[in-house]
């Protein structure tokens, strides 16, 4: 009888810890994204360039990924796409 009670208590504590962890992970993963095109190529430090471009925006973005856009016409300057995110 005592073993069953202890097993039940340990199971309840374990379930509580698992549920709490899942809620923490879901809260940490919520990020707001913004994609925007800028003139120029990404180069070696494209992610830093994107962070600099987004510095003057209303929100502070902390993660960026730079991708060179396909050039449609040779007469147009090269473009890059910045995909940046911040905690919501």
UniProtKB/Swiss-Prot annotation:
Its main location: secreted. One of its GO terms (biological process) is defense response to fungus. It is found in: Secreted. It holds the Pfam family SCRL. The keyword Transmembrane helix does not apply. Disulfide bonds join 32-88, 42-66, 50-82, 64-84. It comes from the Eukaryota. GO terms for cellular component: extracellular region. Residues 1-27 form the signal peptide. InterPro entries: SCRL. Keywords: Antimicrobial, Disulfide bond, Fungicide, Plant defense, Secreted, Signal. PANTHER family: DEFENSIN-LIKE PROTEIN 228-RELATED, DEFENSIN-LIKE PROTEIN 245-RELATED. Belongs to the DEFL family. This is Putative defensin-like protein 228. It comes from Arabidopsis thaliana (Mouse-ear cress). The lineage of its organism: Eukaryota, Viridiplantae, Streptophyta, Embryophyta, Tracheophyta.
């Amino acid at each position: 009888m005592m073993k069953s009670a202890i097993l039940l208590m340990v199971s309840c504590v374990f379930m509580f810890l698992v549920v709490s962890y899942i809620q923490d992970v879901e809260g940490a993963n919520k990020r707001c994204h913004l994609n925007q095109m800028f003139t120029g190529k990404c180069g070696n430090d494209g992610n830093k360039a994107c962070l600099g471009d987004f510095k003057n925006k209303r929100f502070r973005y902390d993660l960026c990924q730079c991708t060179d856009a396909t050039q449609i016409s040779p007469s147009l300057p090269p473009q890059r796409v910045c995909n940046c995110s911040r905690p919501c």
